[in-house]
Structures are given as structure tokens and as C-alpha cells.
A protein has these predicted regions:
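A broadly conserved amphipathic alpha-helix scaffold signal in soluble, globular proteins
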Residues: 118, 158-162
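Active-site scaffold of zinc-dependent metalloenzymes
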Residues: 70-107, 117-124
Length: 223
């Protein structure tokens, strides 16, 4: 069943006109999972509740986000695709029986919804980083090529497993190591990204000014 759901997700993803995503390193996936739990109020040892996060936490960070619960009788996306996230509409769509079972704590359905929640969170992160032009947080942006989307689905599975079972994020690490890996290093990268962006913009502005002055000088000499 999980394999069928996975294949159905790939087929759906490659149809998206805006199926762009962040391609993360292993450290990036760990960082995403750690901060996902932190911002969702789970900390390092709390229980991650994807339905609660979808309904209450994500809207706090992204006002454009929405979700839809569709009755099984009206579900036209195939038998095996039980839920999906569409980045173009910024919406999670879930079949109602899957939603109800997830509320009841059925593990497979909890994982299914958690997977889509992680997709949404990755989309939020991507839009934020694109807006800040902080490219150090990502290794590449991939289009809706089927092989690339397959990699993205595997990446999302990995982050989802870390979000639901976070022991490996902090296991064997001291408090100082956790602070360094998940707080200090990302902050340094973020600040460096901002400085690089500011410097690039300044150089472009100076070049534009020099070009403008050269044109004016040519015009003056011509007169």
C-alpha cells in the first residue's frame, strides 16, 4: 500500500506546474526536521501531531495555506493516492477516511498526513529562502522532472521519519553540540547569505551608477 501511495504521489507531483523544491544535504534534512519540531512546539522529545500542525500551526506561519478534506465518494484522484500537497494552490488535500483514521491514531494514516505536512513546510522554507536569497541553505532547485521529484519524495520521507522519530537528531550529542549544529551554524550561514546578497546588490548598484556616469560623459563630450 505504501509503495502504491508513493508511486501515485510521484505521478501527481510531475503534473504540477510549480513543482520546484529544495534539494537538501543530510545535515539540511536534520536541520529541517529539528526546526520543524521546534516551531511546532514538539521540542526534542514531544509527540508530533500532523493533523494538529496542519490545522493550527502552519496557518500561523503561512496565511495563504489551506487544506481540504474530501469525501471518499467524491475522491477522483485514484485508489492509492490518499493525500497530497499542491504547491501551486498551497493546499493539502486529504481523503476523509484517511483523515478520520489519522485522528484515531492509525499509524499509516498519521504518516501519510505527516508526509504532506512536511511537503508544505519545505515549500514554506523554500519561499522564505528565495525571498531572502539565502542560497547557502540549499544545494539546488529542481524542476518537475520525474527523477528529481523521486529524489524529493525520498527526501520528504526521510524528513518525515526524523520528525516522527527524532532520537537520532540529538542522540549522543552534548548540549553544546546541539547548540552548534542547529542554532549557531545555521545563524552564521543565514547572516553570511544576507551579507553576500547585500554586497552583490551594492556592486550592481555601483556598476549601474558607473554606466550612467559614462553615458552622461559621452553625451557631454558629443555636445
Amino acid at each position: 500500500m505504501e509503495a502504491c501511495q508513493y508511486e501515485a504521489q510521484i505521478k501527481t507531483a510531475v503534473k504540477e506546474q510549480k513543482a520546484e523544491t529544495i534539494v537538501l544535504t543530510d545535515d539540511g534534512m536534520n536541520l529541517t526536521a529539528f526546526w520543524t519540531r521546534l516551531l511546532c512546539g514538539c521540542g526534542t522529545d514531544g509527540r508530533f501531531e500532523p493533523v494538529y500542525v496542519m490545522e493550527n500551526i502552519i496557518p500561523l506561519f503561512d496565511k495563504s495555506f489551506n487544506y481540504e478534506i474530501v469525501e471518499r465518494e467524491s475522491w477522483f484522484y485514484g485508489e492509492y493516492l490518499q493525500a497530497f500537497y499542491t504547491p501551486e494552490a498551497n493546499k493539502i488535500v486529504i481523503r476523509d477516511d484517511v483523515y478520520e483514521r489519522a485522528l484515531a491514531g492509525v499509524a499509516l494514516d498519521v504518516i501519510t498526513i505527516a508526509h504532506e505536512v512536511v511537503h508544505c513546510i519545505q515549500s514554506i522554507v523554500m519561499r522564505f529562502l528565495n525571498a531572502m536569497q539565502c542560497v547557502e541553505f540549499k544545494t539546488a532547485i529542481c524542476s518537475n522532472d520525474s527523477n528529481e521529484m523521486q529524489q524529493h519524495e525520498l527526501q520528504t520521507d526521510r524528513i518525515t521519519s526524523l520528525v516522527l522519530s527524532p532520537d537520532s537528531l540529538t542522540e549522543g550529542k552534548t548540549n553544546n553540540e546541539i547548540l552548534q549544529q542547529y542554532f549557531i551554524n545555521p545563524l552564521i550561514q543565514f547572516v553570511c547569505g544576507l551579507i553576500k546578497t547585500a554586497g552583490k546588490n551594492l556592486l550592481e548598484a555601483l556598476n549601474d551608477t558607473n554606466c550612467y556616469n559614462e553615458v552622461k560623459e559621452v553625451e557631454r563630450c558629443a555636445v
